[in-house]
């Protein structure tokens, strides 16, 4: 009987040791490492408490979110335009084309004034005298010529490009003295190899527009009155032509020189600026 009780006791001890070993081998929750284990009377309650316990992780330092990179939108480049119609090509003349037309108009207007001073006939009568073509047969061409000059004079045919003046020469007292090896033009502030009158191409363009207006209105006036430009001037002002001969000669010479004189500056188009 005593042996049986001893074996039973030993068996109980072994069972307890086995149970404690099984308990040790069971996976424990993470909270058991950070929180002290509390002795609970009922293991089922501790298991349920550990199953309901949740741990929240709070980050002390958060990585700063990067701001999205700004997209740089290239600014659209403005076109070099100066015309009334703004056609950007099409029927639009460049300023260089209009400059050529203005030079032709200056030569034509000066020649018509000189011819009227010699022959006493207007530009249309001179055309009839030189070619023998009656004016009424050339009316369509004449109307086109008048319209073309009027539109060109107000800048309606050109819209592309611009003239850029050359940089101004330096000024000062040191520039008032003629430097060694330089001529008299450099003392006046003029470029040695440049034109004498220092006309810019923009100035020449303006004078060409005036010549276009002069030709157009002299033709219109001659169609209406039958008189040339000088006779119209005499009719409007009452001043005899012989009294304004110096002014007339100056205008003729001025238009001729302005037409053949190369202006300073340069012509820039849209493609060259890009």
From Swiss-Prot:
List the keywords (alphabetical).
Chloroplast, Membrane, Photosynthesis, Photosystem II, Plastid, Repeat, Thylakoid, Transit peptide, Transmembrane, Transmembrane helix
In Pfam terms, one family for this protein is Chloroa_b-bind
Transit peptide segment: 1-66
Q: Where are the sequence repeats?
A: 61-166, 167-274
Subcellular localization: Plastid, Chloroplast thylakoid membrane
Chloroplast as UniProt keyword = yes
Bilayer topology term: Multi-pass membrane protein
* Membrane listed as a keyword: yes
- Which Gene Ontology terms of cellular component type are present? chloroplast thylakoid membrane; photosystem II
The record's Gene Ontology biological-process terms are:
photosynthesis
Which InterPro entries does the record match to this protein?
Chloroa_b-bind
Transmembrane annotation, as ranges: 104-124, 138-158, 205-225, 240-260
Role description: Seems to be involved in non-photochemical quenching, a process maintains the balance between dissipation and utilization of light energy to minimize generation of oxidizing molecules, thereby protecting the plant against photo-oxidative damage.
- Entry's family note: Belongs to the ELIP/psbS family.
UniProt name for this protein: Photosystem II 22 kDa protein, chloroplastic
Question: Could you tell me which species this protein originates from?
Answer: Nicotiana tabacum (Common tobacco)
């Amino acid at each position: 009987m005593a042996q049986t009780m001893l074996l039973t006791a030993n068996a109980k001890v072994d069972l307890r040791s086995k149970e404690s070993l099984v308990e040790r081998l069971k996976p424990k929750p993470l909270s058991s490492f950070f929180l002290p284990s509390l002795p609970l009377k009922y293991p089922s309650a501790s298991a349920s408490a550990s199953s309901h316990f949740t741990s929240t992780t709070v980050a002390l330092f958060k990585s700063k979110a990067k701001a999205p990179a700004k997209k740089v939108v290239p600014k659209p480049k403005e076109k070099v335009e100066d015309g009334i119609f703004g056609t950007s090509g099409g029927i639009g003349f460049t300023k260089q084309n209009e400059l050529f037309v203005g030079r032709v108009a200056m030569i034509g207007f000066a020649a018509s004034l000189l011819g009227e001073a010699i022959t006493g006939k207007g530009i249309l009568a001179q055309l009839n005298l030189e070619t023998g073509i009656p004016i009424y047969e050339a009316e369509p061409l004449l109307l086109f010529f008048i319209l073309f000059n009027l539109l060109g004079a107000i800048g309606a045919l050109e819209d592309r490009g611009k003239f850029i003046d050359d940089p101004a020469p330096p000024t000062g007292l040191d520039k008032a003295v003629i430097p060694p090896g330089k001529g008299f033009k450099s003392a006046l502030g003029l470029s040695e190899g440049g034109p004498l009158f220092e006309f810019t191409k923009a100035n020449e363009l303006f004078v060409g527009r005036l010549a276009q207006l002069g030709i157009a209105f002299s033709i219109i006036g001659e169609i209406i009155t039958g008189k040339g430009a000088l006779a119209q001037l005499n009719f409007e002002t009452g001043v005899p032509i012989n009294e304004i001969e110096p002014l007339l000669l100056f205008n003729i010479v001025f238009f001729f020189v302005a037409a053949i004189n190369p202006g300073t500056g340069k012509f820039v188009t849209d493609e060259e600026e890009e």
